[in-house]
């Protein structure tokens, strides 16, 4: 196997519902910016490399930037890291975005994170608990979310307004072989989408309001929003990341989700430059100068 300077790995098609082109383009454009800096960049699809034994038996690349998320790829990519390759995002950072890891990490480190817990999708063990949740004054609705990776199909994230709806969502997960789900309290307010690059030094940040909502435009501190978002990213060790937050009527900000390397669709051109600059800052000088 020929040793490569930089290698880009696209996201799995399954993990790009309605975003296949957008996910493809942000990685491709990032690579083009790096090529413009005189670096050799090659791209591969995860399906290409997952089935190739020869792929993993050769020398690892010096640097890989990747959007793939499945464990069948993360495990061998971790071996690349152990052999000295630089991965952006790192394998552990990507794993940290699996909700069964993310929920405990962010619940313990953040002041404003919605009450969230992992629950069994076997509703036989949930009947009394579900009834009690909605009997309590002021409780509900709740979000039911897939416990590991982010959206792969409709129903992976949905709002339940009654115990019956929670039960139906859990049963749907169980029918797909998903043993656990996340039960997360709903926070009322303006829903904001977030994008970030970097952890310290030169960083890049953008936000926008989600579509399809009755927007109240509650006032809030953009500095506080940025600080909270980057704090969460550092907790998970993410370098290229996206997320969602809610701004309440009182101006409080709750981070409700964070993920590795989103599509950056509306900011694709400037985001690709920011990501490439970040990657360049992580490349050993001996590679950058070759």
Task: List PLM regions with ranges.
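A short beta-strand motif that forms the metal-chelation/ATP-contact edge
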Residues: 6, 61-65, 194-197, 251-266
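Conserved N-proximal alpha/beta basic substrate-recognition cap immediately N-terminal to
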Residues: 10-121
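Short glycine-rich anion-binding loops that position phosphate/pyrophosphate groups of nucleotides
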Residues: 69-71, 147-149, 261
